[in-house]
A protein has these predicted regions:
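Long, compositionally biased, glycine/small-hydrophobic-enriched stretches that function as flexible linkers
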Residues: 1-159
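Generic, low-specificity signal for short hydrophobic/alpha-helical stretches with a mild N-terminal bias
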Residues: 21, 25, 122, 173-176, ...
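Glycine-rich phosphate/ribose-binding loops and adjacent secondary-structure elements
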Residues: 179-240
Length: 240
């Protein structure tokens, strides 16, 4: 299955970056969730390593820095900013400034909520938390990521309820979320229904990601073939 592929990818990149990993027993009834968690943590580790190397090269390698600035939308602005800070800052201060300006992106995870097949072990059906989508959600929730889960392809009330079990989906003492919820929707009605369903469980939707029903299927409600313009207008008129 896809979890087997993910494990192969994890081993490939662990070997490429010389990162030791612990083999996962695929006979473990929770292997799917463990594989997801281990893979996501590895991705986070690699991103962190590459980001640190990127910052170091920005500070120390002028050719690398100039090539990077050329990739940014406002090249001249960043060239001026760099000249201003480099003229009055130590290398350590410049490194800290660069870290603040050039943060790595969020490692988000997409879950197709309806792909939630039941699983068995030794011929016996496992509890619902071992269903495919439930296991993926658990794998994400238990990872070290500070990012978002994107719920797509319709509603799964059981999965929504299961999200309540993980503290990272709720705000911490500082009011921030370690794990945010993004819901893909095709129209306002879908956003309203799913948003209310999650709100009743105490779960906050950080973003509704709108996709036209003309170029994607499998959403909670079939659309009438409306284009994106009228869909966005309805959100604009009815948002509170």
């Amino acid at each position: 299955g896809d979890d087997f592929l993910i494990e192969k990818v994890r081993n490939y990149y662990a070997d490429k970056y010389s990162i030791p990993v612990v083999p996962i027993d695929r006979k473990d009834k929770d292997a799917r969730a463990i594989i997801i968690t281990s893979y996501l943590d590895l991705v986070a580790q690699i991103v962190e390593r590459n980001w640190q190397e990127h910052i170091q090269r920005l500070v120390q390698d002028s050719e690398y820095r100039e090539n990077f600035f050329q990739l940014l939308p406002d090249t001249a602005f960043w060239q001026r900013e760099w000249q201003t800070h480099s003229a009055s800052s130590s290398q350590m201060e410049l490194t800290e400034w660069a870290k603040q300006q050039f943060q790595p992106g969020s490692i988000d995870v997409n879950i197709m909520t309806k792909l939630d097949k039941k699983n068995t072990s030794n011929g016996e059906e496992l509890p619902v938390e071992y269903n495919d989508a439930h296991a993926i959600l658990r794998g994400f929730a238990l990872s070290k990521l500070n990012s978002s889960v994107v719920l797509s392809a319709g509603m799964n009330p059981l999965l929504f309820s299961y999200m309540q079990k993980f503290a990272d989906f709720f705000p911490g003492n500082d009011g921030n979320f370690r794990k945010k919820i993004i819901v893909k929707v095709s129209d306002y009605r879908s956003a309203l229904v799913q948003g209310k369903m999650l709100a009743k469980k105490g779960l906050w939707v950080s973003e509704f990601r709108i996709e036209s029903g003309l170029n994607c299927g499998g959403h909670a409600f079939p659309t009438q073939g409306h284009l994106m313009g009228p869909i966005l207008e309805e959100f604009k008129q009815k948002r509170t």
